């Protein structure tokens, strides 16, 4: 097996699982803040580990898919981008944006069904991830099992691609600048964690409105067009609704970015 592929596979799995387990309670609080009816109506501080099962099951394969795609596409796209533009910095930014976007789309094949199950369990639609999955498989709304599991797919993609287009070029830029400043070839795991935290926090705050839309679509009883939902939310709850949960989301992803990318760098350095 190719060493780069194996390094990305194992590093991604370790990073994804550790981050989701540590920060799951904050994600639960964020989801309940964004859900219709508000925080306490959807469970408040009770059962903040509800839905953890689906998150853990999806963490390793989802993160592995992302990094395998991201790292392999970086190697393939960098020479291509270098031929398209004379600016080395622009070529690097475009490479990281495209590679991370393709990585996110791959990861969402696993992540979206897990998110649907997790968020419905977090907001007390059911008592466990397994019970939520069984309910979706019974297809009570008649929309179809696959449609039910992948509800909010495009909204998730529309949230994740802007997020990753901000996070990973910024993350790679900060790492490069830090390495140049310290006169080292590659940043250490803790330095990568700091860069990941800064990049993740900025990207999280900027994409909160898309995250709110994604959460509402996944929790809605039936499929609803995204623009229709956005207009309804604005009319009924005002513009502030699109920034609900920005604090927990930014805090969670900023701290999560430190662990996610710190663990990734630490494990990757072993190969």
From Swiss-Prot:
Solcar-type repeats, residues: 3-76, 91-177, 187-270
SUPFAM superfamilies: Mitochondrial carrier
Domain of life: Eukaryota
Record's keyword terms, sorted: Membrane, Mitochondrion, Mitochondrion inner membrane, Repeat, Transmembrane, Transmembrane helix, Transport
Gene3D superfamilies reported in the protein's UniProt record: Mitochondrial carrier domain (1.50.40.10)
Pfam assignment, any one: Mito_carr
GO MF term set: S-adenosyl-L-methionine transmembrane transporter activity
Record-given protein name: Putative mitochondrial carrier protein PET8
A GO CC term attached to the entry: mitochondrial inner membrane
Entry membrane topology: Multi-pass membrane protein
Subcellular location: Mitochondrion inner membrane
Keyword Hydrolase: no
Family affiliation: Belongs to the mitochondrial carrier (TC 2.A.29) family.
Subcellular location, principal: mitochondrion
PANTHER family listed in its UniProt record: S-ADENOSYLMETHIONINE MITOCHONDRIAL CARRIER PROTEIN (PTHR45667)
Transmembrane intervals: 6-26, 51-71, 97-117, 152-168, 193-213, 251-271
UniProt keyword Chaperone, yes or no: no
InterPro entries assigned to the protein according to its UniProt record, in alphabetical order: Mit_carrier (IPR002067), Mitochondrial_sb/sol_carrier (IPR018108), Mt_carrier_dom_sf (IPR023395)
